[in-house]
Amino acid sequence: MSSYKYYDLIRKPIITEKTTALSEQNKYAFYVDKFAAKLTVKKAIEEIFKVKVKKVNILNVKGKNKRFKGIIGTQINRKKAIVTLEKDNNIDFAGGIK
């Protein structure tokens, strides 16, 4: 699989207080395509960020019910991947921001 398809597979990183605390344990969270499998997520992360992946956990997140201007709607369902890296690897999302 070429690298441009890997970029389509990984939607965006999840940067919250909880995932920032996980990054100290070499775990990083990403929203991925809803048809993504563990093996393809592992290959995509290794190809894009040039790191060695130890383990991938995937979970489906159900969309919340929301009200907008009196109309009840539903947010989209998402798939979340929590990627554990090998010991000496890390991903820097900030990229030199001070």
From Swiss-Prot:
Membrane-spanning parts: none
Pfam families: Ribosomal_L23 (PF00276)
Gene Ontology biological-process annotations: translation
Keyword hit for rRNA-binding: yes
Assembly and interaction partners: Part of the 50S ribosomal subunit. Contacts protein L29, and trigger factor when it is bound to the ribosome.
Function: One of the early assembly proteins it binds 23S rRNA. One of the proteins that surrounds the polypeptide exit tunnel on the outside of the ribosome. Forms the main docking site for trigger factor binding to the ribosome.
Protein name according to UniProt: Large ribosomal subunit protein uL23
Record organism: Rickettsia canadensis (strain McKiel)
Gene that encodes the chain: rplW
